[in-house]
Amino acid sequence: MVQIETERLVLREYTPDDWPAVLAYQSDSRYLRYYPWSERDAEAVREFVAWCVARQAEAPRNVFQLAITLPATGGRLLGSCGVRVNDRARREGNIGYELDPEYWGNGYATEAARAMLRYGFEQLGLHRIWAQCNADNTASAHLLEKLGMRREAHFRECDQFKGRWWDSFIYAMLDHEWRAAPVG
């Protein structure tokens, strides 16, 4: 079982009972803006949480998707953050994160993503970690830059949903960059 504590957060394994908290924030229109679906239902969220729980038992484990909780609020679930090992031979993985819009602007997503970078480089021994974000999501792009990740690609009109084409950015960091200038 993986549990990561930061200055303000606890990133912990999902449990099946987490789905109502996930549904609450994934139903917010601000959250839904950059996702292909226009609404979330209980079944889809239960499937997501069950998928996260099932990854905990895999061997070797390649997906470390953790619930972001805030001890100061009694352990309220604020979002999700994870690192996935994409290619063990090349020691490559990616990170992703999402946060309840009620908690945006407090640095929680940055703190959680930094913890997952640290876990990926220092515990999993990854060489390269990348992240993808919607190019219109300037807050997410800024977060990745604040972590010290470099923009490596701009994919133009690579996704189509909600009646339009969307661009994506790819950011990445290498293990020697992490060691040379640890972010946090």
Role assignments for model-derived ranges:
Residues M1-E102, Y119, Q123, R164-G184:
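GNAT-family acyltransferases
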Residues Y14, V85-N86, W130-Q132, R150-W166:
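Conserved catalytic-core motifs of GNAT/GCN5-like acyltransferases
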Residues S38, Q65, A115, Q132-C133, ...:
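Proline- and acidic/polar-enriched loop/turn elements at helix boundaries
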Residues D41, D136, D159:
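Positions that flank functional sites
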Residues S80, N94, A109-L117, F155, ...:
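A generic structured-segment signal
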Residues Y97, G105-E122, T138-K146:
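Conserved acetyl-CoA-binding loop-helix of GNAT-fold acetyltransferases
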